[in-house]
Regions:
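Conserved acid/base catalytic micro-environments in cytosolic active-site loops
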Residues: 1-2, 6-22, 28, 33-36, ...
Length: 344
């Protein structure tokens, strides 16, 4: 589905998509409102969405488009989608899967068609269990009652957080509630294109009020720091003679995601056992569900974001429905709970 107010852009993008011979344009619409109406009765795999449009602009419509898409990936194609631009980061925070700078009218030549096909192909890569596929379905709501918060968190040394669509905003809310005195390490696996990871790290450092860096192989895990998985590798934790460290790997994960939350959770469970806390925030699919099970088996609590505050209650919903959530809470409450637990 193409959503762009420019007739020329819709025409050119349609030709390029059809020219891939792998993807087919089912509709090309000129405004976000029409797109929402179309998605009420039609299913698509990928949505190309412009930002600057009359009426409802793309950013304003994005959360509703993500929900109406029922698992469709949203690719922002806009002239204001420069990497690192505030608009781009906001789009990713609101649920876009990726962004692509749209050239000006009359400048659609060069490699743009090739880059567009590459982005579409990446968004539609097949996966093992639908975890990161374009048609992953959110689970049905589960009746999960949180246990008493203060009775839940025993002393811990590390927090591992997994998130995808809508997870950046949730992570921001969570980090704002963690006090500056918090000295436990925080690991984050967020589904984002590799090119955005350094901007993301800078953003988290400001929000979290503590150093944040993109993981490199054999990086030591130190107190009071945030480490995020790079976009092109899984983040795993290993024991070393000098303490815990990061190892990066690129093997296939069952979820099909790169990076995947499962390897992070599984390795954290192995190294830290009950001295860890797992968190699953808003995201499409089931990534993190298998790893959450390993954390629970090791005696570590797993906190899942609630459905009401999730852009997509896929990942946290899968954990809750599988009985692997110690508590289901809004992200700000998760942050306060973690902060209180560390202070005990």
């Amino acid at each position: 589905l193409i959503v762009d107010d420019s007739v020329v852009a819709r025409s050119v993008l349609s030709r390029m998509v059809e020219g891939t011979r792998r993807f087919h344009v089912v509709a090309a619409l000129g405004e976000a409102r029409s797109a929402l109406e179309y998605l009420r009765t039609n299913r698509v795999d990928i949505i190309l969405l412009d930002i600057a449009m009359p009426g409802i602009d793309g950013l304003t419509a994005l959360p509703d488009v993500v929900l109406a898409g029922q698992g469709a990936k949203v690719l922002i194609v806009s002239s204001s989608a420069d990497e690192g631009a505030a608009t781009t980061l906001q789009a990713l925070a609101l649920g876009a899967a990726d962004t692509l700078v749209k050239p000006g009218v009359g400048a659609f030549g060069g490699r743009f068609a090739e880059v567009l096909e590459e982005r579409l192909s990446k968004l539609f890569e097949p996966t093992g269990d639908g975890g990161c596929s374009a048609r992953a379905q959110p689970p049905s709501p589960a009746a999960v009652r949180p246990r008493s918060p203060l009775a839940m968190l025993e002393p811990f040394q590390i927090v591992a957080i997994g998130a995808s669509t809508g997870g950046i905003h949730a992570l921001s809310q969570l980090l704002r509630e963690i006090p500056a005195s918090f000295q436990q390490a925080i690991l984050v696996t967020q589904h984002l294109p590799p090119s955005f990871m350094h901007y993301f790290a800078t953003q988290l450092a400001v929000l979290g009020g503590r150093p944040c860096e993109v993981a490199t192989d054999r990086l030591r895990i130190r107190p009071g720091r945030i480490i995020i998985a790079p976009g092109e590798a899984h983040l795993r934790v290993v024991r070393t003679s000098e303490g815990a460290a990061i190892r990066l790997s690129t093997e296939w994960a069952k979820s099909g995601c790169m990076p995947s939350v499962d390897p992070m959770f599984e390795s954290v469970a192995e190294v830290y056992a009950s001295r860890a806390v797992g968190v699953v925030l808003s995201g499409m699919g089931r990534d993190g569900c298998e790893g959450a099970g390993r954390l629970i088996e090791a005696g570590a609590p797993v906190l899942a974001q609630d459905q009401a505050t999730s852009v997509v209650w896929g990942m946290p919903g899968a954990v809750a429905n599988a009985g692997r959530a110690t508590a289901v809470l809004p992200p700000d409450e998760i942050g306060r709970l973690i902060g209180r637990g560390a202070a005990r």
